[in-house]
Amino acid sequence: GRERVKKVLDAVDAEIADFERKISSGQSRERVLTEMKEAHEGFYASVRNIMRDAANDVALRSAIEGVVAELISVPEQFEVAIEMALGSALQNIVTKTEEDAKYVIEQLRRRNYGRATFLPLSLVRPRTLNENERAVTRTPGCFGVADELISYDNKYRNAVSNLLGRTIIVRDVDIGIAINKRVGGTLRIAT
């Protein structure tokens, strides 16, 4: 219920506070995100290491499309909501095929880098709203479906839709709860 939502929000607030300390040094939020992407700073060590190696390894680089955080562009007003909605999936490694994912997994294992989560474009299926659910997104205070509020190359549509196609971004928790009640609690909500 609401307590659980509060716990999630508190955890996210703690992460944001850390992020904002970096921002308070006069950097724009966008620059921090860009630096995070470029250095893969704030990423799991396994992801950071394999992406660093991919920069100098043609076979590895050709197997990896990128990490989710690099493949999406988020308007500033929705950054916190999208970060919250995606959580660790921001670090999922997108590959063209299952074979590419297997190759990268093998490289992670060989290099003792640990684990990572993969989204092979050949396998991943989009998640969408039904008509009834889509109708509630027109409620005042609902900004829309998360995957429709961000930009990305069309070839990543299924992956982005899989992660965000059933998440709606709302102005506040109360609106989210009210909307979700109307569709039987089937949607993910982010503020």
Predicted regions and their residues:
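Extended, EK/Q-rich alpha-helical coiled-coil segments that serve as long dimerization/scaffolding arms
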Residues: 1-41
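Hinge-like oligomerization/junction regions that interrupt long coiled-coil arms in large cytoskeletal
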Residues: 25-191
